[in-house]
Curated annotation (Swiss-Prot):
Function: Part of the outer membrane protein assembly complex, which is involved in assembly and insertion of beta-barrel proteins into the outer membrane.
Species per Swiss-Prot/TrEMBL record: Pseudoalteromonas atlantica (strain T6c / ATCC BAA-1087)
UniProt keyword Signal present: yes
Protein name according to UniProt: Outer membrane protein assembly factor BamC
Transmembrane segments: none
Family, as annotated: Belongs to the BamC family.
Family annotation (Pfam families): Lipoprotein_18
Length: 368
């Protein structure tokens, strides 16, 4: 009988605990009798008696004029602070800042930083079905439409009824660019808030922790931005690993060159892989100018391999220093081979390298 009573009590406690609402879990446990207490007064000392020295060790500081005075008792939420999470490479936050904001540094030079951030934010809003009330790219400001979330609140555990709660929020995003254009600050502000339970409005903007709401939406935007970067990196990695076709043509200076059927940003790392595979040691490079300074060492093959087969990646080149010039040609990329004096290879000499370059460039499983 005792065992049955214990099990029954445990089940009842579990049911009651499970039915506690989010609001109940965010307030302190225990009673709130202290809210009814009145401030004490100093001991009244008669005028003809020496006044003792009272300790001020436990005196509470006075509130500022604009400090909130209604967050006491059940109205005071006991929750962990909302923190902005800088998940994106090149992002960071100001420690101790009271604002919901995040800093982004330029990492990808394929497009302006502000364009990248706005595109990611617009993509997030579209994915979540959130409308836009206004967007001014020149003023770097966007205001969302109402973000509506619905939740069914269960009544008491012994009741079969439920209440529908709607929360509606509107946010403003501001983007501040540094003069050099390579650092931006994205700010989130809660513009308006309404909460309804059934037909009654139970909370408005003044009743909620605005910063918690702002940090929550900002973290979701940052998470979406970081996800987009990971997807783009994975796609780019697949494109780099995938074989590329080359032909012989001319570069922008009418010099004989290999023409790669890929854009510059994808072809550049692919060229580095191909050169390494063919026995070139890259001494220095400048991607912004498309220059590679290399030394040809020949391919490294073991003694056993040399006995049974010829090195199919060997090139008819002296083991010395060379240069490569990589140029953006729209949907294609030109690769010009130069000697150490920056003189382009002739078409005949370039043709002697074509078969090996074309085969390795077309390899679908080149190691990265």
């Amino acid at each position: 009988m005792t065992t049955k009573f214990f099990i029954g009590t445990a089940i009842a406690v579990s049911v009651l605990s499970a039915c506690s609402s989010l609001e109940e879990r965010q307030i302190a446990s225990g009673n709130f009798e202290y809210t009814k207490q009145q401030p004490g007064h100093d001991i009244q000392v008669p005028a003809d008696v020496d006044r003792p020295n009272f300790s001020q060790a436990y005196k509470l500081p006075a509130l500022d004029a604009d400090a909130p005075r209604n967050f006491i008792g059940k109205k005071l939420k006991v929750v962990s602070p909302a923190l902005v999470l800088p998940l994106v490479t090149g992002s960071h936050v100001d420690d101790g800042s009271k604002d919901a904001k995040v800093f982004f540094d330029q990492v990808d030079d394929s497009q302006p930083l502000d364009t990248t951030i706005w595109n990611s934010l617009l993509s997030y809003l579209e994915e979540q079905g959130i409308g836009i009330e206004s967007f001014d790219k020149d003023k770097q400001r966007l205001v969302t439409d109402w973000v509506v979330a619905k939740e069914i609140l269960d009544d008491h555990w012994y009741s079969w009824s439920s209440v529908e709660r709607d929360t509606s929020q509107r946010f403003e995003f501001d983007l501040e660019m540094k003069p050099h254009g390579r650092t931006a600050t994205l700010n989130a502000h809660l513009v308006d808030y309404k909460e309804r339970q059934g037909e009654a409005v139970v909370a408005e903007k003044s009743d909620v922790d605005s910063r918690a709401k702002e940090v929550d939406i900002l973290n979701k935007v940052i998470g979406h931005y970081e996800y987009q970067i990971r997807v783009a990196d994975a796609k780019r990695l697949r494109e780099i690993r995938r074989g590329m076709q080359i032909t012989i043509g001319q570069d922008g200076e009418d010099a004989p060159a290999f023409i790669i059927d890929s854009n510059y940003d994808t072809a550049w790392p692919r060229v580095l892989l191909v050169l390494r595979k063919l026995g070139f040691d890259v001494k220095d490079y400048d991607k912004s100018n498309g220059l590679l300074f290399v030394k040809y060492n020949g391919t490294e093959s073991g003694w056993w391999d040399s006995v049974w087969s010829n090195d199919e990646n060997a090139l008819p080149l002296e083991k010395q220093e060379y240069r490569f010039r990589v140029e953006d040609a729209g949907e294609h990329t030109s690769l010009t081979v130069l000697d150490n004096e920056s003189t382009p290879f002739t078409k005949d000499k370039l043709s002697g390298l074509y078969d090996v370059f074309a085969r390795v460039m077309a390899d679908d499983n080149l190691d990265i």
